[in-house]
Amino acid sequence: MCKFDLSKPYCFYFNEISKIPHGSFDEEKIADYVYNFGLESGLKSIRDEFNNIIIYKEASKGYENSAPLLLQAHLDMVCEKNSDSDHDFKKDPLDLYVEDGWLKARGT
């Protein structure tokens, strides 16, 4: 059963990015969010002219000599909506809800 609990960091941040329109070729606002998250967290953050972002996090104490880990993701979202939806992916946040154990976005 899906429990979308905003007290959990992964739910909180997923909810935050769902408020930011970020369709393909419209990634600047989500790139701003991710880049600023890195800076505000005190992490070395790099952004290029294509909105690619690298955020560096030093190893935790005791793991300084371990192999590095890289997580890679894309910032854009495929924008598909139901035929009866008036959702505007350029300006509207996603309206998240849980139904039958699945996290969904209303109208999409």
Where are the language model's segments positioned?
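N-terminal capping segment at the start of a domain
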Residues: C2-F25
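Intrinsically disordered, low-complexity boundary segments flanking structured domains
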Residues: F4, S41, N82-S85
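Generic hydrophobic segment detector
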Residues: Y13-E16, R47, N52, W102-T108
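Short glycine-centered, acidic/aromatic-flanked micro-motifs in structured strand/loop junctions
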Residues: I20-H22, K57, A73, G107
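A non-catalytic alpha/beta surface segment that caps or lines the substrate-entry region
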Residues: G23-L69
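Active-site metal-coordination/substrate-binding segment of hydrolases
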Residues: Y63-T108
